[in-house]
Amino acid sequence: MPVAVGPYGQSQPSCFDRVKMGFVMGCAVGMAAGALFGTFSCLRIGMRGRELMGGIGKTMMQSGGTFGTFMAIGMGIRC
């Protein structure tokens, strides 16, 4: 697929750049959601201190990676 040229001679981002941008945006949104849901679920089962921070971090990484992967796939389909 040829690269489209926008106004003022600017080129559009490549397909790989779009997929990469989708992954980063998905990671950011997924980690924010994971922080909220992870905090709630860890506090609900009674975690405190280091265990709480580990549980929240684990949930943030899992949800960030999952949502980032799906966003990257979605951006790849749109290329």
Swiss-Prot record:
Sufficient for antibacterial activity as annotated region, ranges: 42-60
Segments traversing the membrane: 22-44
Chief location category: mitochondrion
UniProt subcellular location: Mitochondrion inner membrane
Tissue: Up-regulated in a number of cancer cell lines when compared to a normal lung fibroblast cell line. Highly expressed in brain tumors.
Note: Enforced expression in IMR-90 cells leads to increased levels of ROS and induces premature cell senescence and nuclear DNA damage.
Protein known as: Reactive oxygen species modulator 1
Gene assigned in the entry: ROMO1
